[in-house]
Design a protein with these regions (language model features):
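Short solvent-exposed strand/turn elements
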Residues: 91-107, 316-328
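Amphipathic, non-transmembrane alpha-helical segments in extracytoplasmic/periplasmic proteins
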Residues: 42-43, 96, 110-134, 148-172, ...
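Short, compositionally biased
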Residues: 77-86, 111, 302-314
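An acidic/polar, Gly/Ser/Thr-rich interaction patch typically located in mid-to-C-terminal regions
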Residues: 24, 28-56, 201-328
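Short beta-strand-centered interaction patches in the first periplasmic/extracellular domains
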Residues: 4, 91, 97-100, 137-202
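Extracytoplasmic/secreted envelope proteins and their assembly/folding machinery
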Residues: 77, 119-122, 155-159, 217, ...
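Conserved "cap/hinge" positions at secondary-structure junctions
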Residues: 65-67, 180, 287, 293
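Assembly/oligomerization scaffold segments
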Residues: 1-103
Length: 328
């Protein structure tokens, strides 16, 4: 009986290190996130003979994953920002994060925008960091009467805007991506494929559903300066409404935050974690997914991939763990 053979490739600043590392590799872990967090690559390498040099921080690692039968899938480029050497036995641990998140994007700034659009702000951020803006049109035309960036990095601003509009807000592959979560499309409008997984595809699963998170609406507050009093807006119904603590500058901003929070609440009611025995490098966050062969509640629910963790090691081969949220 033949078994599938995992395949991987690691390139350091243009030099392919795969053959050199392969006999020493304990495990390779790649975590892909939807936004707000950088994708992360972790390598653990055995250094029993002390012949491996410690990599320098700031070097670039490119990684590809797959199977010998189907080939490799490029998973991006990462910058080494953490190195650990421990023993005995001697082990080198290398941690790298998305190469697109440069130090300049983490530098704090002070500025404001007036009478503009969300698309204009995001285009400015992309241009300053030599990124290609990929902003969904439905969000790009949103009006922003005022926006402050006070002692805040561009990356934090991008994340904050993603929270405000319930959007994927990230930097990947040389592009600044901003698109509605769960839309099933890329920022350019191209449809993402829906994946179907059966119970036979995995060896571990965990499903949970909780009424405590089943809010019927979200109420947000804003300060009416003309009337010098606190007002509120409600998105959804008031039967069991969640109340946001922060007070916003105007009604439109409060409504945007309430709408975004309600969408997050809906996705968080049911959760499904699934580990695939045969890793799938083609899976990534924001893909829609359907399940088959589980309980009725799982099979009838449409799912959205929130996070994927790919692991290659000597004992389990290549596996992929999915964190799924319920999708409307």
């Amino acid at each position: 009986m033949s078994y599938p053979i995992p395949q991987w490739r690691v390139v350091l600043d243009g030099t392919d290190l795969t053959e050199r590392i392969a006999p020493r590799l304990l495990d390779l872990t790649l975590t892909e996130c939807r936004g707000g967090e950088a994708d992360q690559l972790d390598l653990r390498i055995h250094d029993h003979d002390c012949k491996m040099a410690l990599p320098k921080r700031g070097v670039r690692l490119s990684v590809a994953l797959g199977w010998k039968a189907t080939g490799l899938i490029d998973k991006g480029t990462f910058i080494v920002d953490e190195v650990e050497y421990s023993g005995a036995p001697d082990i080198i641990t290398v941690r790298a994060r998305s190469a697109d998140l440069t130090a300049d994007m983490r530098t704090r700034r002070e500025r404001s925008w007036h009478n503009t659009t969300l698309g204009a702000v995001l285009n400015t951020l992309a241009g300053e960091h030599r990124l290609t803006p990929r902003v969904a049109e439905v969000l790009a035309r949103t009006k922003l009467p005022h926006l402050d960036q006070a002692n805040e990095s561009d990356m934090n601003l991008l994340t904050r805007l993603g929270q405000r509009f319930d959007a994927v807000a990230t930097v990947k592959g040389g592009a600044l991506v901003f698109a509605p979560i769960g839309a099933g499309t890329t920022a350019t409008g191209k449809s993402l494929p829906t994946v179907t997984l059966t119970r036979r595809d995995g060896d571990q699963h965990r499903y949970s559903v909780a009424d405590r998170d089943a809010y019927t609406g979200v109420r947000a507050y804003w300060v009416d300066k003309g009337k010098a009093r606190r007002q509120s807006v409600l998105v959804g119904t008031d039967d069991n409404a969640k109340r946001l603590r922060e007070s916003y500058a105007d009604e439109a901003t409060a409504r945007q935050h309430a709408h975004a929070e309600l969408e997050r609440v809906k996705r968080g009611v049911a959760k499904f974690d699934y580990t695939l025995a045969i890793g799938r490098a083609d899976l990534f966050p924001e893909q829609r997914l359907t399940a088959s062969g589980f309980k009725k509640e799982i099979d009838e629910q449409r799912w959205l991939i929130a996070k994927v963790t790919h692991v290659i090691d000597g004992s389990t081969g290549f596996s992929s763990s999915l964190q799924l949220e319920s999708s409307s």
